[in-house]
Amino acid sequence: MRQSQILPTRQQTVHRSHRMSESLLPVILCLLSAVTVAATNMFVKRGGDVLTARMAVAIVMGLSVLPFAPFVPTPPPETWSLILISVVVHWFYQFCLVRALHRGDLSLVFPVMRGLAPLVTACAAIFVLNEYLTVLQSAGLLLASLAIIVFALPTGQTATARKLDRSALVWALLTALGVGMYAVADTRAARAMPDPMTFVVWLFLLDWVGVTVVAVIQRRGQIGEAMARQWKGGLAGGMLGTISYGLAIYAYTLTDAAVVTALRETSVVFAAALGAIFLKEGFGYRRIIAAAILSGGLLLMQAGA
């Protein structure tokens, strides 16, 4: 057999390298998104007043994309319904997120609400996007879900603390539902746009309205004073949030929605670490092991793609 038949040609090598680069791009985007989304939620939780902090983040995200609005393509008329669906789903997610962060530790509720999201996304994507997981991806998803359950188990608190944890867990589960819903809705909308940046801009321009209305009603005459205490964290969290979800939306156009969501959920490790370091929240060896298993399950999902 000739050597040319054994060794790959230069064209084959370049093609394989190109395919590897294409497959790595969504991974890199999602991991960057994971770090920034964990930091965003830390700023929201650190602000104390979670509702006002989330409002500040949403407003900054809207303002950050405003300069780009004149330069992105106008959404086609048939896509406006998709944009509005995404906005409403994001409002639902934000409300549940605020309640979850208000009730529980960042290192507890964040892994649950983010880690279960791939399961919701995978189920919804079957019906909405006609996307199916492979056997290996399904195994990784189940492994990750089991790790999350272990991560979220109580750590011997008093009866009152356990009650608060159960309440936080319910809101975290609803937030996971919201994450899965917006992942599928945003994937469908972003793919229908002439450019992903169009969807990023219009989503963030409209997204801040819901949480702002709720915050103004809840805080009434104290909203100005509350915002004065939150603007620093809101500025940092808002800029990070824009980067985080902007990267995710671009990744949605490159690969399956469930894969993107799963890769972003490696943020649970970053969130737990940030909660322990900056917010003085408990962590422990069990959560360290569970977080490692969770990451392994999510990586297994990517390996099966």
List the predicted regions and their residue ranges.
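Membrane-interface interhelical linkers
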Residues: 2-88, 94-106, 153-171, 205-237, ...
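Hydrophobic/small/kink-forming positions within alpha-helical transmembrane segments
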Residues: 34-38, 91-92, 115-123, 180, ...
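Short hydrophobic alpha-helical membrane-embedded segments
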Residues: 54-63, 112-117, 178-180, 239-240
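Hydrophobic transmembrane alpha-helices of multi-pass small-molecule transport proteins
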Residues: 62-65, 122-128, 136-155, 286-305
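Hydrophobic alpha-helical transmembrane segments in multi-pass integral membrane proteins
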Residues: 65-73, 121-133, 177-191, 240-257, ...
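Specific alpha-helical transmembrane segments that line the substrate/conduction pathway
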Residues: 85-90, 102-149, 198-206, 257-277
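Alpha-helical transmembrane segments of multi-pass integral membrane proteins
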Residues: 143, 147, 168-186, 203-207
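C-terminal appended segment following the main domain
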Residues: 241-305
